[in-house]
């Protein structure tokens, strides 16, 4: 049976990944807190854009507002719960999804920062998998519309890094990697913590500068003086 996937947080990253998983034929339900976004996707679909016309598509995955998630109790349990919310929302988002997990289901942290320990505190270490989206640069710029503002990584850059907290390569890590391989390049890592810290260091260099200047990350990278400041 096809694994049932629920994406908690259908914003830029969660919506992009969940939308493309839906495009690839996976059983995906999106969940989000923004009512206008939810209603727009229901009525018009989720519009995904990239750097080329070939990357543009409209998908129609099921989508729920947070207040509607209790409807899962009447449906098949969730095999993969993807948490793609801000770090400070991790605990309640995981707690909300825990009761709908299948007995062998697991939770994937598709987030910045290092939240696997927070998730494990709710569902246990054995039900946690990490997935890093590196240099994906996506933006939910209006309800129902998500764009990617950098080229696909392909052979030049591995975008998705899937890993277990204990570092071993498992069947479920391979399965998750196979799923996202249809979106962009992926690897199963044996060093999830190293990957997490590398991403955190990069975010630490750029996010504060972005907040102070009002510039998105891509514009910071293109500005010689600001880029040098970030590196220093």
Which residues does each predicted region cover?
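N-terminal glycine-rich dinucleotide-binding loop that anchors FAD/FMN and/or NAD(P) in oxidoreductases
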Residues: 46-66, 203
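Rossmann-fold dinucleotide-binding core
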Residues: 76, 110-199, 204-205, 210
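NAD(P)+-binding Rossmann beta1-loop-alpha1 motif at the extreme N-terminus of oxidoreductases
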Residues: 1-54
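A short helix->loop->beta-strand "cap" motif at the edges of active sites that frequently abuts
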Residues: 102-106, 126
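Small-residue-rich helix-loop
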Residues: 222-232
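Rossmann-like NAD(P)-binding element
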Residues: 57-103
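Conserved SAM-binding loop
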Residues: 30, 82, 109
């Amino acid at each position: 049976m096809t694994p049932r996937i629920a994406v908690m947080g259908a914003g830029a990253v969660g919506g992009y990944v969940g939308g493309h998983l839906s495009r690839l034929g996976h059983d995906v339900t999106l969940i989000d807190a923004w009512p206008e976004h939810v209603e727009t996707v229901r009525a018009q679909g989720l519009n995904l854009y990239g750097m080329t016309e070939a990357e543009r598509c409209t998908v129609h995955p099921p989508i729920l507002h947070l207040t509607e998630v209790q409807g899962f109790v009447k449906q098949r349990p969730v095999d993969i719960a993807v948490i793609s919310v801000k770090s400070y929302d991790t605990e309640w988002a995981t707690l909300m999804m825990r009761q709908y997990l299948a007995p062998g289901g697991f939770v994937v942290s598709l987030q910045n920062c290092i939240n696997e320990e927070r998730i494990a505190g709710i569902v246990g270490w054995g039900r946690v998998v990490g997935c890093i989206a590196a240099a994906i640069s996506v933006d939910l710029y209006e309800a129902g519309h998500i764009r990617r503002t950098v080229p696909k990584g392909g052979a030049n850059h591995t975008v998705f890094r899937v890993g277990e907290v204990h570092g071993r390569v498992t069947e479920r890590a391979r399965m998750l990697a196979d799923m996202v391989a249809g979106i962009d390049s992926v690897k199963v890592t044996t060093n999830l913590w190293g990957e997490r810290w590398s991403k955190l260091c990069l975010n630490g260099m750029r996010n504060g500068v972005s907040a102070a200047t009002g510039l998105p990350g891509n514009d910071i990278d293109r500005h010689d003086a600001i880029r040098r400041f970030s590196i220093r």
